[in-house]
Amino acid sequence: MCHSRVLPYAIGQMEIILKYFTEFTDQQLNQFKALEPLYREWNSKINIISRKDVDSLYEKHILHSLSIAAAFEFVDGTEIIDIGTGGGFPGIPLAIFFPGVNFHLVDSIAKKLKVVEAITKDIGLKNITVQHIRAEEVKNRKFDFAVSRAVAPLKDLWKWAKPLLENPIPITIGTQKPNPQFSPGLICLKGGDLAQEISESGTRPRVMEISEIFPEEFFREKYILYVPR
C-alpha cells in the first residue's frame, strides 16, 4: 500500500502518463501519483535529478522510463538488472508497470540508493532489490535483461551487461509491433547522434525512435537501443 501524500499538481502531471497508458490498477495509479512529491522532497535534500526537471518529472523521467514498457512486454518472473539506476530510473517506473517482474537496481553511489530504497518502501513496491555495487562487480547472478538510462557509452554497458545475461528465452514486443520476439539482452535509453558510439561498441543494436511512440518535443532524438545476448 502506498502511504505517501499525493499533491494536486502530481495528479495533474499524471495526465501525460495516462495519455499513453490506461490499464492501471488503483495501486499502480497511487504509486505513480506518489512519486512526484517524494522525489520533490528528497531532491531538496540530495541532488537526485536536475532541480529544473522536478516540475516535469512525469515526462522527462517517468514517461521516458516507460518508453521501454511501450516497446517490450516482460512476462511475470522475468529478472531485470538496472545498471547505474541513479535515482531509480528506469527501474522504479518499470517495477510499478510490471509488478510481476523482479528488478535489481545497482549503483556505485550509496546516497542515491538510499533515496531509491526509501521511495520503494514508501510506495509499497515489493519487486525491487537494491545493491550498492558497480555493475561490473556483480557476481553469481544472472538476469534476463539489463536496462539503463544515460549511464555510460554503449561499449561499456555491453561489456558490463553481457556476462550477467541468461541464455535466450523469448519475450514479445509490445504495442508497436505485436508479433516479433526478443531474446534476453541489453535495453538502454540514449539520445543524440549515436552513430560513432554504436560503431565503437562492436554491437549491432536495434534502434527504436521514442518520438514514434511519444511525439512530445522532449523525445526528439531520443532512442531505445536493444542489443540481444
PLM features: residue spans?
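A short SAM/SAH-binding and catalytic strip from SAM-dependent methyltransferases
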Residues: 145-164, 188
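Short strand-turn motif at the edge of the Rossmann-like AdoMet-binding core
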Residues: 151, 176-178, 188-193
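Active-site capping/gating segments
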Residues: 191-229
